[in-house]
Amino acid sequence: MEVLVNLMPHELVLEIEGRRYIVDHVEGAAVRVSYDLEEIFKIGNKIPVYREVPDSAVVKGLPDPEPGRYFVTSAMVARAAQRPDVFSPNTHPKYVKRTRRTGPIESVCGLISYI
């Protein structure tokens, strides 16, 4: 059996072929990513602009892989994890449902892999 585990701090609402699926978040789950930054320049000699140092990301709190178990996290965590079992919600404007054109996202129609 395949299981989708929501590690985000809120529920995930998927709308697939006209049906809604609500995936509750795991209580107490705290998956985080940290990375090093380096200043690349200043705007107007005052406002610093940083970039993420390549390959410096460290993911904490992500469970180890298990066959048939898939994890949904934030895009930042999924991108840093670089694992085939870790995804983020597909929030591309073409693939979300909203009550208003610029309103909050009600549901997504799929997930995104970053590998």
What are these regions (language model features)?
Residues 1-3, 7-115:
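Intrinsically disordered, low-complexity segments enriched in small/polar residues
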